[in-house]
Swiss-Prot record:
CDD domains: BMC_CsoS1. It comes from Halothiobacillus neapolitanus (strain ATCC 23641 / c2). One of shell proteins of the carboxysome, a polyhedral inclusion where RuBisCO (ribulose bisphosphate carboxylase, ccbL-ccbS) is sequestered. Assembles into hexamers which make sheets that form the facets of the polyhedral carboxysome. The shell probably limits the diffusion of CO(2) into and out of the carboxysome. There are estimated to be 2970 CsoS1A/CsoS1C proteins per carboxysome (the proteins differ by only 1 residue). GO terms for cellular component: carboxysome. This is Carboxysome shell protein CsoS1C. Belongs to the bacterial microcompartments protein family. CsoS1 subfamily. The keyword Coiled coil does not apply. It is found in: Carboxysome. The tight homohexamer forms a pore with an opening of about 2 Angstroms in diameter which is positively charged. Residues 8-93 form the BMC domain.
């Protein structure tokens, strides 16, 4: 049986840092999610990651994608994984300790 966690993962990939910051700000204001971090993918692409309950992550990613589009054509992709497999957890950045 595959091991899964109950916390959803939301991802937004952008062209450039400004849309990424705008998306992160909108996501954390729109819903009860935790900003896990950001990854500089290369070529100017930045991915922002949030965690939380599935409904909250869904609302946050929608808000982040909308905010990102308002600052130009920075949105590359937006995606949610409702229940992340434990093997995938190993490659994700760790959330900062509170």
């Amino acid at each position: 049986m595959a091991a899964v966690t109950g916390i959803a993962l939301g991802m937004i990939e952008t062209r450039g840092l400004v849309p990424a910051i705008e998306a992160a700000d909108a996501m954390t204001k729109a819903a009860e999610v935790r900003l896990v971090g950001r990854q500089f993918v290369g070529g100017g692409y930045v991915t922002v990651l949030v965690r939380g309950e599935t409904g909250a992550v869904n609302a946050a990613v929608r808000a982040g994608a909308d905010a990102c589009e308002r600052v130009g054509d920075g949105l590359v992709a937006a995606h949610i994984i409702a229940r992340v497999h434990s093997e995938v957890e190993n490659i994700l950045p760790k959330a900062p300790e509170a």
